[in-house]
UniProtKB/Swiss-Prot annotation:
Induction section of the entry: Up-regulated during osteoclast and foreign body giant cells (FBGCs) differentiation by TNFSF11 and cytokines. Down-regulated by estrogen.
Disrupted gene: phenotype observed: Mice show a lack of multi-nuclear osteoclast and foreign body giant cell formation and a bone-resorbing efficiency reduction.
Transmembrane regions: 52-72, 82-102, 122-142, 227-247, 304-324, 402-422
Keywords: Differentiation, Membrane, Transmembrane, Transmembrane helix
One term under GO cellular component: membrane
Domain of life where this protein originates: Eukaryota
InterPro entries for the chain: CSR-E3_Ligase_Protein, DC_STAMP-like
Organismal lineage: Eukaryota, Metazoa, Chordata, Craniata, Vertebrata
Parts of the chain on the Cytoplasmic side: 1-51, 103-121, 248-303, 423-498
Swiss-Prot/TrEMBL GO biological process terms: cellular response to estrogen stimulus; cellular response to tumor necrosis factor; multinuclear osteoclast differentiation; positive regulation of macrophage fusion; positive regulation of osteoclast differentiation; positive regulation of osteoclast proliferation
Protein name: Osteoclast stimulatory transmembrane protein
Pfam families: DC_STAMP
Subcellular location(s) of the protein: Membrane
Length: 498
């Protein structure tokens, strides 16, 4: 058993070692590509080629996404979006290749998706996806069910009127024979069949017009959603630009991270004691942790997103329900049989002369036939007319529903990863502007040094006041408490980034 256990542990150790080795080998080219992409001026031909290749790839990706957004999702025609996306891709390539801050701004927009503006963009795109694909599909299936009902109603009405007409024809052909027997046979329909048909047609048209109104509202909502999505996208880029501007102009902005570069700088200066008791606002980037308040805020916002997921699930369920309803209605209408009807009318008229004498003589009566007629009438009962087209049920848009749900789940994930997104933005900006990051680290080191000197000064004050305590007991404690929490950190809390 010990041998098997040792062999298993050895295999797990080798597997973990090879896994780490593979990860390290995979990270090396990624680090080289990131270094080339973040360089303002490439240092070699390899970095230049890598930078151009990345710029072309990103420009193609942006152009492809824009074309998909304009054509496939937002229902634009095929002509203008192709030209617009081509010009957009060329502009993005030139901007990324020639202007390094634009590259930084583009990369900063990725972690900015974890902010409130990014969540709004994701949720807006999700709602647009549902409005384009799922809602019209639901309305189309409900309209198909209404069209089936209209066809069956019209066919049943025509069959009823046709039956009445055939009975009237039978009564008309039996007219001479029935008049010979001093009786008449008539069939009438109370009311006008044309008026009833017109009334049913009017009701059906009103129902279809109601659904057309809903489709118009859906298209109007789609147009509004296009504008809102564009505004959110501009807001996302604007927030990234605002962060980059504050990073480059304000040394105190978002300067609350104990990075590895800061640790090395303090070690070189022999000031590692500044991190022995760090202030509460200093964040360790190597081991980021969320506070209790941040976790509670995430849970509350996740509850709101859960309600949105429930609404999306109800919409998708409505899509499936409308599809099943339309499918069942169309299948039921197609299976309605054509009922053949044959009406055979036989009419015999006879009379008897002095039948009471034959009755007294116990003789059978003698009947004289003076009129006899037999007719057959054939027609069919059709519940669906020939000229009525039965529409096909539209299957649910599974891909659109999954995409909308995935975007909403991604928006929920950004709530938890929001704190890490802020750290990632700082890391990205530091990679593109190392000189500015060096100035910011020097400012942070000076800030920590001032706080440490002030703490040492406060620690020396109780000893001084202790010499006077014999004359005025409690005076030292009151002097320390009178300085308030500002005495521990006169610089105050960091900037509130939200």
């Amino acid at each position: 058993m010990r041998t098997i256990r040792a062999a298993t542990e050895h295999l797990f150790g080798l597997g973990w070692k090879f896994w780490r080795l593979g990860i390290c080998k995979a990270v090396v080219p990624l680090q080289a590509a990131w270094k080339a992409f973040s360089q303002p001026v490439p240092a070699s031909c390899n970095e230049l080629l890598t930078q151009l290749l990345l710029c072309v790839s990103l420009a193609s990706l942006i152009a492809g996404l824009a074309h998909h957004w304009l054509v496939s999702l937002q229902l634009y025609p095929l002509g203008p979006p192709a030209l617009v996306t081509s010009l957009c891709g060329l502009f993005v390539f030139l901007s990324l290749g020639l202007v390094p801050p634009i590259r930084c701004l583009f990369v900063l927009s990725v972690p900015t998706l974890g902010s409130k503006q990014g969540r709004r963009l994701l949720l807006s795109y999700s709602a647009a996806n549902l409005a384009v694909a799922v809602v019209p599909n639901v309305l189309g299936n409900v309209r198909a069910a209404g069209q089936v009902l209209s066809c069956v109603t019209e066919g049943s009405l025509e069959s009823l009127l046709n039956t009445t007409y055939q009975l009237r024809q039978a009564a008309r052909e039996l007219g001479p024979a029935s008049r010979a027997g001093s009786r008449s046979l008539t069939f009438e329909v109370e009311g006008k069949g044309s008026a009833f048909r017109l009334h049913m047609h009017t009701i059906t048209q009103e129902i279809l017009e109601d659904f057309s109104g809903l489709e118009f509202l859906a298209r109007a909502a789609l147009g509004t959603q296009r504008v809102v999505t564009g505004l959110f996208l501009l807001g996302l880029l604007g927030e990234s630009a605002w962060y980059l501007h504050r990073y480059l102009t304000d040394l105190r902005f978002d300067n609350i991270y104990a990075t590895r570069q800061l640790v090395r700088q303090l070690a070189q200066a022999g000031a590692t004691h500044l991190l022995t008791s760090p202030p509460p606002w200093l964040l360790q980037t190597a081991q980021p942790k969320l506070s209790r308040e941040e976790l509670l805020s995430c849970l509350l916002r996740l509850g709101l997103l859960a309600l949105l997921l429930v609404a999306t699930a109800v919409t998708v369920a409505s899509d499936y329900g409308a599809f099943l309803l339309a499918q069942a209605a169309v299948a039921w209408a197609q299976k309605l049989p054509t009922v053949p009807i044959t009406l055979t009318v036989k009419y015999d008229a006879s009379y008897k002369v002095l039948d009471f004498i034959l009755f007294v003589l116990n003789q059978p009566p003698v009947e004289s036939v003076f009129a006899s007629m037999q007719r057959s009438f054939q027609w069919e009962l059709r519940f669906t007319p020939h000229d009525c087209h039965l529409p096909q049920a539209q299957p649910p848009r599974v891909t659109a529903a999954l995409a909308a749900g995935a975007l909403q789940l991604l928006a929920g994930a950004t709530l938890v990863l929001q704190a890490y997104a802020w750290r990632l933005r700082h890391t990205i900006a530091a990679s593109f502007f190392p000189d500015q990051e060096a100035r910011r680290l020097s400012h942070l080191q000076a800030r920590l040094q001032r706080r440490h000197n002030q703490s040492d000064h406060l620690n020396k004050q109780p000893g001084t006041m202790a010499t006077r305590e014999s004359r005025k007991p409690g005076q030292g404690t009151r002097t320390l408490e009178s300085q308030g929490p500002q005495a521990h950190d006169s610089l105050g809390p960091p900037y509130d980034l939200e």
